Amino acid sequence: MRKLLVSFLCACIIFYQKAISPHFPPSCRYEPTCSQYAIESIKKYGPFKGAGMALLRILRCNPLCKGGYDPVP
């Protein structure tokens, strides 16, 4: 069940990367991008902890942050 949920969440993020994101100018201040960070964290830590980490990362990604290199721990 966990693997199915991980696959579903990653597929949703990849859909966003391929179908939605190209229609907007790049705005992520981090490397890897927030969507790539989300995929990596979900695969590494599972659907709940990984999605929570991704959400916190997205909340940090704003005009007031420096950004830069911030890999999944």
Curated annotation (Swiss-Prot):
It is found in: Cell inner membrane. InterPro entries: Membr_insert_effic_factor_YidD. Pfam families: YidD. The keyword Cell membrane applies. Signal peptide: none annotated. Keywords: Cell inner membrane, Cell membrane, Membrane. The keyword Phosphoprotein does not apply. It comes from the Bacteria. Its main location: membrane. It is a peripheral membrane protein. GO terms for cellular component: plasma membrane. Could be involved in insertion of integral membrane proteins into the membrane. Belongs to the UPF0161 family. This is Putative membrane protein insertion efficiency factor. It comes from Treponema denticola (strain ATCC 35405 / DSM 14222 / CIP 103919 / JCM 8153 / KCTC 15104).
